[in-house]
Amino acid sequence: MENSKTIKLGLIFLFLLFPFQSFAYKPTTTHAGFTQEIVDFYNFSKDEGDISKEIKELIIQGSIEEDSPSTRAINHFYDPIRNIGLYGMDSAKYWAMNELGALGETKLFEKKIEGKRVVIQGELNDFTWPKILHYYATGDEIRAYLGLGHILHLIEDMGVPDHTRNDPHMGEGTDGYYTGESPYENWTGNTQNRETMKGLAKEVLTKGEKIKILSSLESYFDEMALYSNKNFYSADSVQNSVYQYSEPGVREYDSDYGYSIDPKTGKKYKLVISTNDGYGNRIRQISYNGNTSVLSDYFVQLSPQIIVNGAGVVELFFKEAEAEKKRYKEEEKRKWEELLVRNEAQMRE
C-alpha cells in the first residue's frame, strides 16, 4: 500500500516536472482524427440536423485540449474489471462526471465563432458531462461543444488497452518511472491522423454499422472499456505480476502469431506475436523487431467501436442537452412568475 501511494505521488510529481509526457492517443493527430470521424459518422447516420463544419471543429478542438495540461491524463484510465483508475485512483468515468479540480485546469485558448472572439479561461474549464449540459441549456453552446470534445477524448481513450488494463506508459528509464512506452499508441500516433483516417466513418457505415444507443454516459464508458480490456493486450499486461486479467485468450497459434476472435464481428485477428526463447518457452508480445501487424489488427478492430460509441455519445448529448434546456427555461419562467407575484404583492401593500 505504501508503495502504491509513492507511485501515485511520483506520477503527479513527474507530470509537473515533465509536462510534455502524455498518457493518450496523440491529441493533435489520433484524437483529432477519431473525433472528426465520430462527427462525420453521426452526420452520415442522421437524415437531418447535421453538425456544421464550424461546430465540428469546436468539438475536435475540445478533444485536443483534454490533454492540456498533461496532468489531466492521469485521470484518463478506467479498469472496468476492478472499477478503478490508474493505480487505484479515480477513473476516467468518474472524471467525466465529477471534475477533479486540482489536476483539471486547462490552458487559456480562444475561439472565433460567427465573427465573435470568445476567450475560455479560469473556472470555465469544467467540462464534465453535467456542466456541458448546463452550458448548452443556458445558451453557451461554444463551451458545450468544446466540452463534448473533451468527453469524446475520454471515450476514445477507453479504446486503448493501456488505459483499460491499468498500464501507464510515460517512457523508458527513470524519466518514465520505468513504465515503458506504449507500442500501440506510438504506432497510432505515427500513422493515424485526420488525413489518414479521413473516410473511415463512411467505411464503417457501408459495413452496416449504426450509432450505438445506450442509456447513459457511464454505459458508454463501460461498453468501450470492457471491449478493449477483454479483447486486447497492452505491452505490460500480456503477463503481469501485479494483476493478471483472465481475458483475452489466444484461440489458436501458427508459427508466428496467436489469434483471437472478435466478439463483435466474429472475425479472427492477430492478438500476439509468438516467438520462442530458445528453451522451448513461448514468448508473447504485441510488437517485435519492427513488426507492427498486431497493432494494425488492433486498430482495425477497435476503431469502428470507438466511432459508433462516440457517435452514440453525441446523440445522447443532444438528447439530454435539449431536455436540460427545456427544464432550464421552465425553471427560469417559474422564477420570473414568482418575482412578478412578489412585486405585485409589494405594490398592493
Report the location of each language-model feature.
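A general boundary/transition motif marking the beginning of the first structured unit of a protein
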Residues: 1-2, 298
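Bacterial N-terminal signal peptides that target proteins for export
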Residues: 2-10
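Bacterial N-terminal signal peptides
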Residues: 10-19
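N-terminal, motif-rich segments that launch catalysis or mediate targeting to/interaction with membranes
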Residues: 22-150, 154-157, 161-332, 336, ...
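Non-catalytic terminal regions with compositionally biased, polar/charged low complexity
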Residues: 347-349
